Amino acid sequence: MASLTSLIFVSIVTAAHGQTVVSIPLGHNYTLIGPPITSEVIWTKLGSVDYFDIICNKTKPIIVTCNIQNLTLINVSKVYSGYYYGYDRYSSQYRNYLVRVTQLKTTKMPNMAKIRSDDNSLETFTSPTTPDEKNIPDSMIAIVAAVAVVMALIIICMLLYACRYKKFHPKKQDLLLRLNI
């Protein structure tokens, strides 16, 4: 079990190293470029039902086309999100991709009445005023009091330690603890 967990962890770390992050709009096609090849690139998708799912020969749940080097994702949907790993069978060349599927965002023209009202509000803008000394927030007073109490406790602990150290170790002469108490 530990070896399987370590294999998965090493695989994910290897896949995350040197990866290219790709954002693909929903419903579009996208081609992942494979590594330089000497024979044929094998494409796998990490994180699917099988940990290493070879995807060039499958049609479900994602539809892809593979040539010797590249992988084309067809009609991208949310299922396509994940890590894609392409490696050459006979060399150590590989490419990692993190595919993120995004929604296309439509932009609306702003309302001109809203823009005019925003212009008017800019004209009446005043700079913020600093708080009066009489209006100090309670939270600030509590924070300052807490810091003062903690500093006092630290000083008391240091003095108690110095006194106890001198009492139990009278023969040791520590330059920092030469207190005539």
Curated annotation (Swiss-Prot):
UniProt-recorded name of the protein: Early E3 20.3 kDa glycoprotein
Residues spanning the membrane: none
Residue positions with a glycan: 29, 57, 70, 75
Record family assignment: Belongs to the adenoviridae E3_20 family.
Function description: E3 proteins seem to be dispensable for virus growth in tissue culture cells. They are potentially important for virus growth under special conditions; E3 region may help adenoviruses to evade the immune surveillance of the host.
Keywords: Early protein, Glycoprotein
Species of provenance: Human adenovirus B serotype 35 (HAdV-35)
Keyword Glycoprotein annotated: yes
InterPro entries: Adeno_E3_CR1, Adeno_E3_CR2
Top-rank lineage group of the source organism: Viruses
UniProt keyword Ribosomal protein, yes or no: no
